[in-house]
Amino acid sequence: MKVFAIAAVAALTAVAVAGPVRPSGDKYLIELGPGKTQWVTKDQKHKMRAAGQTFIDITNEIGTNFVATKPVAANYPKNIAHSSMVSSMIANLSKENLMRDLQAMSEFNNRYYESQTGVESANWLMEQVKKVIDESGAQGAKVEKIDNQFNQFNIIATIPGSSESTVIVGAHQDSINQEDPMGGRAPGADDNGSGSVVVLEALRGVLGSKAFRAANNTNTLEFHWYAGEEGGLLGSQTVFSKYKSDGRQVKAMLNQDLAGFKGQGQEQFGLITDNTNQELNQFCKMIVEKYASIPIVDTECGYACSDHASADRNGFPASMVAETAFEDSNPHIHSADDTVEYLDFDHMLEHAKVALGFMTELGMASNL
């Protein structure tokens, strides 16, 4: 995830050249807002990110005639319908699992999407997802890797439903040291190891529930871990552009990016209200009020601040519940200091409750 510092990036963005024709040299086309594109080098991308500028790298869309799409129609429940099931699942969520998994993710030198340790960390995460599925014995559940045009791969776990309507919870798995992306130490405990382990624990919670497995979920559930978010939402773009071209019926996507920092003031979630789906946001508020023990406040993070923007841009309703109001986010991200010592695992467990409630209520919803 990225944090704004607009004035600091003005000089950097001024040197970029906008235009549909690719210039000579190693250049990337980025989108800083709807219809606002610029050509930049990889070094310029890194400097812009370090200065807080958010963007989507749309280089792979050249020649595809991409057109932003209106959201897929969805009918979200107006009332909680499965509180007994969800409450029993929440009781089995484990703070110890979150601590163990996040410690392991943080031990890689970095999880940068072009580094060798970025691949090694993805392989480790893939093995954890496989283990959860295998130990559950759930029929039909599977995990697959989705390759990108760079080293690190996406991971998608699927619990098939009886309909083609799909509900997603996702998090980016990569990390970055903004001073030295390829080789620098980037434990990425909060950004975004925290979101990654929350999604993993939500998967454990769903698959570990005999009541859920016996209920035969109506809608297909997917748990995503995206590669290359720090390079401009690269991995999530791979996934959602493919889903768009395939005509997938993604009815809801919940993004978990930054889930462990409690902030200095009142403990609360931040509901991202820009570049998200307002109807789905209202549903998220209902989930938080029912299943979490802390409040939620509206906040904004800017265009393309995280992977929900890839879903939204491709026509899929998306929301993001962040660790705090955006202005109170963790100041240690994108550095060697993004470590577990600054995180609160009780707060992270609240995120897991929300993810579990979101997936279960929508997974069981009829006529979504």
From Swiss-Prot:
Disulfide bonds join C301-C305. Its EC number is 3.4.11.-. Residues 1-18 form the signal peptide. Keywords: Aminopeptidase, Disulfide bond, Glycoprotein, Hydrolase, Metal-binding, Protease, Secreted, Signal, Virulence, Zinc. It is found in: Secreted. Glycans are attached at N92, N192, N216. GO terms for biological process: proteolysis. Binds 2 Zn(2+) ions per subunit. Zn(2+) 2 binds at D191, E230, H334. It comes from the Eukaryota. Its cofactor is Zn(2+). One of its GO terms (cellular component) is extracellular region. GO terms for molecular function: aminopeptidase activity; metal ion binding; metalloexopeptidase activity. It is an enzyme of class 3 (hydrolase). Its main location: secreted. Zn(2+) 1 binds at H172, D191, D257. Monomer. Belongs to the peptidase M28 family. M28E subfamily. Probable extracellular aminopeptidase which contributes to pathogenicity. PANTHER family: AMINOPEPTIDASE YDR415C-RELATED (PTHR12147:SF56), METALLOPEPTIDASE M28 FAMILY MEMBER (PTHR12147). This is Probable leucine aminopeptidase TRV_05750. It comes from Trichophyton verrucosum (strain HKI 0517).
